[in-house]
Amino acid sequence: MPSELADVCCERKPRPADQQRRRLIKLLRAGADVNATDKNGVTALHHAVRFRSPAAVKTLIEYGANVNQTCRRSGSTPLHRAVTQTGAPGTAGKGQAALEIVKLLLAAGADPAVANRAGKSPGDYVKDPLMRSLLQQRTRRSKAK
């Protein structure tokens, strides 16, 4: 079932968001592991972020997805993927979706200080000034605790 979750999150032309959400919930209620990974340590959440699907991201978070899970190959978290300028092929022009996803991940506890295998945090990749500001605010709050 992990691949089924990923398949729903990787649709190039996803169905309406509510339909995608219902499909994910059905799989999760049937026992799919929300944090299952493929051979590269990539979760359904990583895929949902890459394919710029806020509805899928929100649903997976609601069902306990680990927002700080790192990929085995690159060490990237879902937040790393969210702030990069390019998503998956076919997701061009979805900047607003990327911003919404960053907000969802941060609200769920994504740590903007986590470095990938290249030693870079999400803030090292972000180009959008609003995203940069959100990451900086979260980093300051984390350090203040």
Label every model-predicted segment.
Residues 49-76:
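Alpha-helical adaptor scaffolds
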Residues 34-37, 67-71, 112-115:
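Ankyrin repeat boundary signal
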Residues 17-26, 77-78, 93-107:
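Glycine-rich, flexible loop segments associated with nucleotide phosphate handling
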Residues 7-19, 47-53, 81-98, 125-129:
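Ankyrin repeat A-helix N-terminal signature
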Residues 1-40:
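N-terminal segments that cap or nucleate solenoid repeat domains
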Residues 41, 74-75, 119:
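Start-of-repeat signature of ankyrin repeats
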Residues 106-107, 111-143:
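Leucine-rich solenoid repeat scaffolds
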Residues 25-33, 58-66, 103-111, 137-142:
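Ankyrin repeat domain, specifically the short helix-to-loop turn at the C-terminus of the second helix
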